[in-house]
């Protein structure tokens, strides 16, 4: 790959898209100066954590527009002309597509193509013959047959990506007009095809192994070096290939070395998907963990009791920490029903605000923080810890990132924070991360 590599700018719709790279910046704000930090950084890639998956379509659109508007100015001021833009989203196809890619294309303009690349190998998501699969207990299952396709906000009916595109664009892009990059094409090389793409043509890309995407990324970077402009709607694995960063500084099993104190840590669990609940059960069987359940039904039905609830939780946490144990703060596990999607999203904000007030009230000498759930993790970084940016250290488990707060953080200096997506890892994964941090 050539040295005049384009800067890779990732707009991440929840903060877990950096789950396959390391040593780069995650930005929690997108004012011009903060974006320039990312553009000027030595790493070839940086992430802007927009958290749009937790927002309404209208809000997602306006946030994306604001990022792109500021990005245009920041790019000009930094004198950067060669860049790739990635709208990083979910490997199970949930999220605001095509809203985000449409806005990026409108604002930054001139893209020759946009590619859907949802493969995420660490999480068992592969794409073959343009059909996207989730590997469940060793069996590749078309993703439209899983719980994710029935998501109450982002439901869809197709695993065959051209049909997914037609469904999501409401027929604006027809399935037959989608360029399909199959495994055989990718493995032989796609450069000639990439050079011919124009007018923001939609392409869908297969991937069974990291080597497939490495090959595709090589062709993408060559074409970009010749002046082609590309936009991506992808999961995390293509980022590994585009950034090409090599191995992380400290091995996953040794990342407990980043702890600033010898005290216990804290764990916060917001995600309510089935996998998280199973992982939580295993975690609570670990020595020196103590569960603190937050009754979300009570929060919904008696909002006036919120302050009392917060005070009770923080009191429990303080006692647990004093006893040299790790509090595991989690929301009650049932997914509540609401009269409308809007009401559900609004209540999500109420729960998140409570969780973030808990984070702000954690003992100041905790040695680590684990945040479970994508949206929860975003809120922990931007609201709970009020970070402008954080340096990504790497992954403590495949697909599970660790960042560190700055040395001058007012509440938690040099605190390692684990960003653990809701639907990643086996049932022992959360317990494994806890064990690694206790070493």
PLM regions and their residue ranges:
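Conserved, well-structured core segments that form the ligand-binding/active-site neighborhood
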Residues: 133-313
